[in-house]
Amino acid sequence: MKIAELDLPKPAKDFLKAEGFSKLYPPQEDSIAAGLLDGKSILVSAPTASGKTLIATLAMLSYLSKNKGKVVYLSPLRALAAEKFSEFKKMEKIPLGKKIKTQISTGDFESVDKTLDKSDIIVLTNEKMDSLIRHGAEWVDDIGLVIADEIHLIGDQDRGPTLEMILTKLKLLQSKPQIIALSATITNADEMS
């Protein structure tokens, strides 16, 4: 499938082409077929370098072109969060009828960053999302799309319980956000989904 065939606004497709994307890889095509652009929650288990970040980007572009809510990208690591933030920040130049604002917050877990409520795409560590939920950040109710990277860590004895808890709380939001779970190494994808 070609980028030009996707059900996305022209500015989004132009952005993807400018970033060097013209065709989808099989995991991306499978995600589209599973309802990625239609608001369906999906689990993507695909090898490293198979285009999981593009899957996240496609979901974000689709969501932001149709909705006013917030997108949250969850990462287990600050370094990965910083890397993805710099990639997603490029989307700020896409004219989708509104100015897209991207922000990252991975620091102090006992504070609520008051500027996050003005952002459309928010990149967080799992622990920061947990802190924001516990401290009652009002914008959490506006989340419409959650992308959880490295979802296989849900089985980790140290980090798994936090990830499981925040995903459960996010699923229960009144806005019923679409959840895209990404992993390169998950072994029980059918059971987890």
What residues fall within each predicted segment?
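Conserved P-loop/Walker A NTP-binding site and adjacent catalytic elements of P-loop NTPases
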Residues: 13-15, 19-193
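Conserved ASCE P-loop NTPase core motifs with emphasis on AAA+ ATPases
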Residues: 1-15
